[in-house]
């Protein structure tokens, strides 16, 4: 639910086009629709949850409960109406009034997992500007989202653990069909570094805790973690 506020803040500070103009492509797509791809059709046939939601079932499935097939055109006039409201009335229309009331009602009415979202939660929501989180990797500085996001910390740890490795030597190899594919050694090194990074992420990173960002991205600490990567899978990594 924070996306609209975030986009509105970005538009206020950096936007060049009128707010309403930005919605036109999405409105057109919602009204004219798109064709279900073979991949989406396969996913719909396997998904165990969508059919349990009345709105999703009406959108993705036939009246008899079978999923709509590849080649079927899906349109979403309800989404188009929402987007037209936001385009004309601005971001506040998402956080107060009929749209907000409908979202709260939907969350509370879920048959198996009702939530506690309130009208006050939506009405009081504000987008926050945060300083980016940056780390060094060889000659580059890489920046991304800070906490409470966890992605940049994980990337910083992975890069840090692999910094001493000659990754440039592990160039992609030619596959059987002529396509380039990552070498097995490169995949192994990345997978093990990611395994360690996510073990730390699960232990130390959450929304409402004091995350030890400096320690997690410390070069010496990451060098120690990197030494745990051997020639075979470590199995379950420990934080």
List where the protein language model places each region.
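Gly/Pro-rich active-site capping loops and adjacent beta-alpha segments
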Residues: 1-14, 151-188
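Short alpha-helical scaffolding segments that buttress acidic/His motifs in well-ordered protein cores
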Residues: 26, 83, 158, 193-197
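Noncatalytic scaffold domains of N-terminal-nucleophile
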Residues: 1-96, 100-150, 167, 227-232
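Internal maturation/activation junctions in enzymes
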Residues: 167-239
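Low-complexity, intrinsically disordered regions enriched in charged/polar residues
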Residues: 38, 116-119, 152, 211, ...
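Short conserved micro-motifs at the rims of enzyme active sites and ligand-binding pockets
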Residues: 146, 154-156, 209
